[in-house]
Curated annotation (Swiss-Prot):
It is found in: Cytoplasm. Its EC number is 2.1.2.1. One of its GO terms (cellular component) is cytosol. Its cofactor is pyridoxal 5'-phosphate. (6S)-5,6,7,8-tetrahydrofolate binds at residues 117, 121-123, 349-351. The record marks 224 as: Plays an important role in substrate specificity. Homodimer. This is Serine hydroxymethyltransferase. The keyword Cytoplasm applies. GO terms for biological process: glycine biosynthetic process from serine; tetrahydrofolate interconversion. CDD domains: SHMT (cd00378). The gene is glyA. GO terms for molecular function: glycine hydroxymethyltransferase activity; pyridoxal phosphate binding.
Amino acid sequence: MDFLKNQDPAVYEIFEKELQRQTDHLEMIASENFTSPAVMEAMGSVFTNKYAEGYPGKRYYGGCEYADAIEELAIQRAKELFGCEFVNVQPHSGSQANQGVYLALLKPYDKILGMDLSHGGHLTHGAKVNASGKIYQSFFYGVNDEGWIDYDRVLDIAKIVKPKLIVCGASAYPRVIDFKKFREIADEVGALLMADIAHIAGLVAAGEHPSPFPYCDVVTTTTHKTLRGPRGGMIMTNDADIAKKINSAIFPGIQGGPLVHVIAAKAVGFGENLKPEWKEYAKQMRINASTLATVLMNRGYNVVSGGTDNHLVLVSFLDKDFSGKDADEALGRAGITVNKNTVPGETRSPFVTSGIRIGSPALTARGMKEAEFELIANKIADVLDNIHDVNLHEKIKEEMVALARKFVIYDRPTY
């Protein structure tokens, strides 16, 4: 088990430092999580050596019988997990999955209607700096002044735009997404409907958030975040024709050989998601996020939409004299890792922002519950109340490190 340590101590030393960082810091970036040693072990397996262009039973290389077996297992487990008919587990990331759907279902300059990035959307939902906003004509809907999606307004925009594809899903929206409403809107304007559930997939799998099926034509997700699997992407549908187009779009459309070792790890992760204890984890994720939101509101902070239904909390500082970047850096000094984030009504640049996004997945994976989240939320508020008090931040960091070391998740950097 010491091959890397003995062969390349310089690399191993960096690994050890990252392990120490992950152990000592309270990871509260909503898109990050701690995957299991079994998933990491699968990613470091002999499958990292195998090329397998194509799909099970239709490869361009020989010697793929076991690559076929592991990919078929991942597909079957994903189908069971999400209750769908067709799954492509080859996308290298959520962005690749979204790009694959667009290539499959759209032509250049077709219209996309997605959620505004500053209102909680994602780059790949048509942002002008992303390929999705360069290849296609992108239009946006957002949230109202209270931070909720206004479905009547979405319908009004859709009637004007007449998009070929509507994208529902977000990277910083703390409320339940009403897929049925989006289906009604899509049907009214004759659009296809895609759900990007990258952030909430683990909740959907556990029944803690409504499923996008049967309302959406196609569904994309990452396999990490709330699913706690390896970093990767996936596309799902119940439509055989769409599935065929998507398979061709992923390979040979935008990718060559799949990452078979990552697909193996996806299979392991899906196996974990199918276990009864997964439902308990997902439920605790929501409870912990709700605890966090309640404490912050009680401490006088503006939680966007007035709370949360999922794993994340979005805090706005539009009423404060400091920025999201200031808060991000101050909390980092206190041993709490969050990310600066744009908020509804944003007045600052995306590099500065007026808010932060805080998530519960990683600390819930470490075994923390309401008591710990109440304590941490109060420490977050203490930091924000004293945004420039570096000495206080360092004192709080000592307390947070002591707390973190009670919930150690890894005993070594590689598995």
